[in-house]
Amino acid sequence: GIAYVSYNTYPGWHTMEEVRQLMLFANRGHDESTHKEKVLRGKTVGSLIGAQILNYDNLKERNSKFLGALRSVMQKDDYYVGHDHLEPHNDPCYLYQFNNHLKAHNLAYVGDADLTLSMVRIYDESIADKLEQLAPNSQADQEQYLDFMLDTTFRKSIICKASAAKDISYAVSNPAEVNTIPVRTVINNFTFQILFDEEALEMFENTLVKDTFQALIKDGGTFNMIEALAILKAAHEASSASDDELEPAVCSLYNAVVEHMVRGGIRFYKTFPEKQEYMEGLSYVPTRFTNLVKAIADGGGEYIYCGNSFNDAIGDISEEDLMFMELLNKPKSKSTLTKKIKDTIFSADKSQTGKHQNAMAEAFYN
């Protein structure tokens, strides 16, 4: 199996540490304050200090890196600021230190969940070559040099047991190997979800690849390689292009998919999360889930937020959301739910007849 560990990293956190110490200093003597009050105080003082620095050109130039870090923190959500900058324990490390710690515990480093921090071949070829020259036998060391270049502040490392390390391959990120049979076999096992829209299609130089992605986006953006290749071949036939143009287009398609897998334009799944459909008389929301969401809505949002099956953050939870979660605390019939919807939402509207209220509740249910 694998495990996921996220942590703050040097060298980027050397500057972030200055912001953290400023916020801790601003909150000294305020132990009785709530977490939210401490975050507000830290942000207020940070904004004040930043504004003073900006008033003087010499200070602005000398502290440009600190100002960048401060600006970044000011724009973050309160829960993040509280977690990273006001918690008593925050011990960043370099990637090589993290890797040494893994080795000492019979574990191995696989890569980063942010593939741009691991797949060094997506960068300029000269950069990738230089990193390989600096650390020819160590992927982790190449990434450490990359961290110095990017001033990385945060990593999301994927790790495994040392005994499984022999199966790790980074060939998928190498343009020279993307169209080999082993790499194509790996890519063919995923389901993909396109995150960019049609306006971004101009980035594809190959017309057949562009037409393929346009068709996939119009079809909802979720696909596998069998479907994508079928669309590409149909586009090739429709364009009356020569047979010699098909294989280069297939290679370009694989290259495009891999590049956007790494850069974040395409999500990829070994098992695509299926949407759970509501089933009358069967579906319900366990009380423990409702209680958790209620705790988040009642102030827990300072510390934690909800996410969906794609690991996207869910915004503000409304009273209406909670109401429906509570209504569905056990399986109910449609008639029971529509009556409760009518009584809860529409019965107060005296301008509507009972018949109209029933119709609105029915429409709301559907």
Please state what every model-predicted region is:
Residues 120-135, 140-155, 159, 200-366:
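Long, charge-rich, low-complexity alpha-helical segments
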